[in-house]
Amino acid sequence: MRTVPALLFAIASTASAQGAAADASGGSRRAKVPFGVGERMEFEVRFGRLKVGNAHMEVVALESLRGRTAWHTAFWVQGGNFLYRVNDVYESWIDAETLSSLRFVQELEEGGKNTTRKFEIYPERAVFIQTNKKDPKEEKSVPNPLDDGSFLYFIRTIPLEVGQTYDFDRYFRPDRNPVRIKVLRKERITVPAGRFNAIVIQPVIKTKGIFSENGHAEIWLSDDDRHIILQLKSRLSFGSLNLFLKRYYPSPNP
């Protein structure tokens, strides 16, 4: 189950989508996105054929952070067995205008061990600070940075063309770049939430786990303007780790 957190290390993009919608709480402009506050995706987590837990992704709120309007998103993973339990939360704050990461928080409970990491990210200076370190200091980042959770929301805003491979340098920790995305095919699939037309991508990043260069993982997105995450399947040396969408709740205020 140690590979579960790697589910979020999926994807990035080269450019920020700009939109004309005015922010409800101020005068800043928001990028056009296919999600809104209250959107929620619920998943069944399986290891092979065995159900081991649940996960969900949610757009929690539209908040003000350091004078910027930001989408607050969260990803929860809960499950395991009597030998190993996981209760992880990943929270991202994404600039609503530029779709760059402003803050990223990980709270991990895995196998009885608790880990917390908190990052303040400054796109305007291309630096980040891990604030929960004993001696926090500025570290080099990249322009228009994205974190683990914001990758999954950002990829939903851009078109994907079958047969193309995209290399991106937008992960906020430069040593993890580039992220490579292969757009493999389109197909129709059935998940607990229903039957969908899907576009399939394969992410590869410089890390260990399910998205490593030596591994193989695929993500199915709905083949429409929303790019809802429908399922994820991975093949590991000791089995397969999979997520399947079981319920989708659109934003009441898209």
Language model segments and positions:
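Sec-dependent N-terminal signal peptides of Gram-negative exported proteins
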Residues: 1-17
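Low-complexity, intrinsically disordered/propeptide-like segments
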Residues: 10-12, 149, 163, 171
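Acidic, serine/threonine-rich low-complexity disordered tracts
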Residues: 19-123, 157-254
